[in-house]
Structures are given as structure tokens and as C-alpha cells.
Amino acid sequence: METIVLLFLLALVFCTLEMGMVEAEHGCPDNEDECHEHCKSIGKSGGYCVGPHKQTCRCNP
């Protein structure tokens, strides 16, 4: 039972991290418009830079 709960929690964390996160090479932190355009190019509604130093491009659903 403990193994199933642990696997479920790991899967939940993995899925949460995979929701719209892309690497900093998409304009962040210097050019948030590049991040926004990248996200639109992959079918999302847009995106913005997040994180302590705004180095991660996060795409909207």
C-alpha cells in the first residue's frame, strides 16, 4: 500500500512539473515577448517568465 501511495505522489509531482514548463532559452529573463511567442507557436494561448530570476518560460494552457 505504501508503495502505491509513493508511486502516485511521484506521478502527481511529475505531471505537475510537466505542465507548460520549458527551459530559459525561450527569451527569459530578458525578452518575455519571445517566451510568449514560443508558447503560441506550440499551440498554447501565450506565456510568461517565472521563477526567482524569471529564467523559466511558462506557457498558458
Swiss-Prot record:
Cellular component terms (Gene Ontology): extracellular region
SUPFAM superfamilies: Scorpion toxin-like
Secretion signal, residue range per the UniProt entry: 1-24
Subcellular location(s) of the protein: Secreted
GO biological process: defense response to bacterium; innate immune response
GO molecular function, a single term: toxin activity
Domain of life, source organism: Eukaryota
Primary location recorded for the protein, binned into one broad class: secreted
Keywords of this entry: Antibiotic, Antimicrobial, Calcium-activated potassium channel impairing toxin, Defensin, Disulfide bond, Immunity, Innate immunity, Ion channel impairing toxin, Potassium channel impairing toxin, Secreted, Signal, Toxin, Voltage-gated potassium channel impairing toxin
Keyword Signal among UniProt keywords: yes
Tissue expression per record: Highly expressed in non-venom gland (hemolymph) and moderately expressed in venom gland.
Disulfide bonds: 28-49, 35-57, 39-59
UniProt cross-references to InterPro entries, sorted A to Z: Defensin_invertebrate/fungal, Scorpion_toxin-like_sf
One Pfam family hit: Defensin_2
Function: Antibacterial peptide active against Gram-positive bacteria, but not on Gram-negative bacteria. Also has weak blocking activity on Kv1.1/KCNA1, Kv1.2/KCNA2, Kv1.3/KCNA3, KCa3.1/KCNN4/IK, KCa2.3/KCNN3/SK3 and Kv11.1/KCNH2/ERG1 channels (tested at 1 uM). It inhibits potassium channel current by interacting with the pore region.
Family: Belongs to the invertebrate defensin family. Type 2 subfamily.
Full protein name: Defensin BmKDfsin2
